[in-house]
Amino acid sequence: MIQVEIVSPQGMVYSGEVESVNVPTVEGEVGILENHMYLMTLLKPGLVYFNGDDKNGIAVTYGVLDVTPQKVLILAEEAYEVGKLPPASKLKEEFEEAVKKMATAQTMEELKEWEKEAEKARTLLELVEKYR
């Protein structure tokens, strides 16, 4: 068993021991078991799920994944239990707004910021549609 903690600025979202955890990262999905090698990488929006059950889990946005042989710590900008995701209408609105802002971005920095927002909203919307 490996200890998993998922924390957002609002506080602890999940804490428990699991056989395995799958985490979306910028390098792809990472599967983690007890005694995993040390790892630190960046999260990308997606679903963190436990024990191979990809029907339930915690939706995360951007952040950091820190793995030690006994513990997985996920520090996410936003994290939601699958049943508590924002409404689809709100996510669609956020996505459309980000796409509009991308079209009018004045700098590469602005463009990257709005691309990130669009990816986050699109991914959360896909999770809402899949799990509701």
Curated annotation (Swiss-Prot):
Keywords: ATP synthesis, Cell inner membrane, Cell membrane, CF(1), Hydrogen ion transport, Ion transport, Membrane, Transport
Superkingdom of origin organism: Bacteria
GO cellular component, one term: proton-transporting ATP synthase complex
Main location: membrane
InterPro entries per the UniProt record, alphabetical: ATP_synth_F1_dsu/esu, ATP_synth_F1_dsu/esu_N, ATPsynth_dsu/esu_N
Presence of the UniProt keyword Transport in the record: yes
An annotated Gene Ontology molecular function: ATP binding
Membrane disposition: Peripheral membrane protein
GO biological process, one term: proton motive force-driven ATP synthesis
Keyword set includes Cell membrane: yes
Coiled coil (residue ranges): none
Subcellular location: Cell inner membrane
Subunit structure: F-type ATPases have 2 components, CF(1) - the catalytic core - and CF(0) - the membrane proton channel. CF(1) has five subunits: alpha(3), beta(3), gamma(1), delta(1), epsilon(1). CF(0) has three main subunits: a, b and c.
Functional description taken from the UniProt entry: Produces ATP from ADP in the presence of a proton gradient across the membrane.
Family stated for the protein in its record: Belongs to the ATPase epsilon chain family.
Name of the protein this chain belongs to: ATP synthase epsilon chain
Organism the protein comes from: Aquifex aeolicus (strain VF5)
Record lineage: Bacteria, Pseudomonadati, Aquificota, Aquificia, Aquificales
